[in-house]
Amino acid sequence: SASAGSHSGSGSHNHEVATGTGIPTADQLRAYAAKVDPYPAEVAPASEEKDHYYTLVARDDIVQNLSDDVSRTVWTFNGNTPAPTLRGKIGDTFHITLKNEGTMGHSLDFHAGDIAPNEAMKTIDPGQTLEYTFTAKAAGIWMYHCSTHPMSMHIANGMTGAVIIDPSDLRPVDHEYAMVATELYLGDNGGTANATKIASMMPDLQAFNGRPFQYDAHPLKVKVGERVRFWLMDSGPNTAMSFHIVGGQFDTVWDEGGYTLIDGGNAISRGGGGSQTFPMLPAQGGFVELSFKEPGTYTFVNHVMSLAEAGAHGKIEVTN
């Protein structure tokens, strides 16, 4: 595989930069999101290659504008948050080169790798390079992140991504999207996350793929009857996620290691079933599938509603 690319421009609260808080309103966040390219949500199928080579460059000086007046400094792998979504199959080997071009120590923890952490996950200093190799032994969407202390700060500042390892019986679909949920704990304007807010576990904002409300401004587009798969991961660092599509029902659900529902049935109920939400604790993930029966605009949210209103909110435009 090619080295992991970067994509520039990936980062609402509900009611105008509330005086003294520095937190943009939902309208301000949507307006700014409309001006920049969205984080690419659609993911390509896994390649047939058995060895995947990626270089991840750690930096801690990237500025992400959230609105016309509010920005934050994010810590990134390859210049964006979340980091690139990697993909492969069971048995594939991933060869990761971590380059630390930041101003402090950084590291990598790949949940998809079943290996001793002592060397592979150690913190490296600015200017150092680390080689990290693992073979994928189990299917799923697996979190990867910086594991340098304090881990909550490194994750909250943006150093997180996903690795998709396909189940062996994964079926083709018309569209595949990856949604990585992240929390924002805003510090001083232009600065990094606020450690006290992180410890309180009460985020100011939440986002799918790094920018609140970006898929309100740039809706996903599918057609009636097309099969759609959403790969989902809650990268936290703190709060639960309950993924829901308003007006949609999931007929196939794959949750942390296996199917709980296939075409509306499972080993016990032989059809006629459905799912309304996909719940995740931090670092959990899976996928859901559905097709839309009617044209319209469907909204996907975190059904922890205060967090949907704080940015974990997007749209799907369905046409004939």
Question: PLM features: residue spans?
Answer:
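Copper-binding active sites and cupredoxin-like electron-transfer domains
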Residues: 1-320
